[in-house]
């Protein structure tokens, strides 16, 4: 009987530890899943040297797409966060640079991390970010304001996708979360 209680206690402890591990790992695992599959409008990350050089060699049409920017914060994140430009017009295959502004109005340092997506969702696989603040955590000191860049391009392969022929605007949206809440 004592062995059964000990086995049950070990089993309960193992299940509890596993559940806690899954809860901490779910956000990064979901982000990786979305990045690999393009699920949920997740953008692609470009390799600057290979992708940009390939783009310069490819014949590009003069198609212009309007990229709109959106910025939100979670309910528990006290930052003020917004895009500096509301929208820009981007020629397919050419790089573009946009900025978001984040302000920490509190009296303590806060570390934030952002999630992002693209709408319409099917455009996510063609939206390639070369450099982005979303690739790592951001620490803002008390009352600090920073401008954060997003360097990107829209893959010319979008021109070959018949489902994307009527798309003339894409929205890039970020939501910042307090790292302590994750």
From Swiss-Prot:
Q: Name one Pfam family in it.
A: CtaG_Cox11
Keyword Ribosomal protein annotated: no
Instruction: Please list the residue ranges that the record places on the Mitochondrial matrix side of the membrane.
Output: 1-7
**Keyword tRNA processing listed:** no
Superkingdom of the organism of origin: Eukaryota
Alphabetical list of Gene3D superfamilies matching this protein: Ctag/Cox11 (2.60.370.10)
Q: Which SUPFAM superfamilies match?
A: Ctag/Cox11
UniProt KW keywords: Copper, Membrane, Mitochondrion, Mitochondrion inner membrane, Transmembrane, Transmembrane helix
Cellular location of this protein? Answer: Mitochondrion inner membrane
Give any Gene Ontology cellular component. Answer: mitochondrial inner membrane
Major location category of this protein: mitochondrion
Q: What parts of the sequence cross the membrane?
A: 8-28
* Topology, Mitochondrial intermembrane side: 29-182
What this chain does, per the record? Exerts its effect at some terminal stage of cytochrome c oxidase synthesis, probably by being involved in the insertion of the copper B into subunit I.
Q: What PANTHER family does the database record attribute to this sequence? A: CYTOCHROME C OXIDASE ASSEMBLY PROTEIN COX11, MITOCHONDRIAL-RELATED, CYTOCHROME C OXIDASE ASSEMBLY PROTEIN COX11-RELATED
Q: Which family does it belong to?
A: Belongs to the COX11/CtaG family.
In terms of NCBIfam families, this protein maps to: PRK05089.1
Protein name, per record: Cytochrome c oxidase assembly protein ctaG
The record lists the organism as Reclinomonas americana
């Amino acid at each position: 009987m004592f062995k059964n209680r000990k086995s049950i206690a070990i089993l309960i402890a193992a299940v509890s530890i596993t559940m806690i591990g899954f809860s901490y790992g779910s956000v990064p695992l979901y982000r990786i899943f979305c990045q690999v599959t393009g699920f949920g409008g997740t953008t692609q990350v470009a390799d600057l040297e290979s992708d940009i050089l390939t783009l310069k060699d490819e014949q590009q049409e003069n198609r212009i797409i309007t990229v709109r920017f959106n910025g939100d914060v979670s309910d528990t994140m006290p930052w003020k966060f917004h895009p500096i430009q509301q929208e820009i017009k981007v020629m397919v295959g050419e790089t573009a640079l946009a900025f978001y502004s984040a302000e920490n109005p509190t009296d303590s340092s806060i570390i934030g991390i952002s999630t992002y997506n693209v709408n319409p969702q099917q455009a996510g696989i063609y939206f390639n970010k070369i450099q982005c603040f979303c690739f790592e955590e951001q620490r803002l000191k008390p009352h600090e304001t920073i401008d954060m860049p997003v360097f990107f391009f829209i893959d010319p392969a979008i021109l070959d996708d018949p489902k994307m022929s009527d798309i003339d605007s894409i929205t890039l949206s970020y939501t910042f979360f307090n790292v302590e809440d994750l």
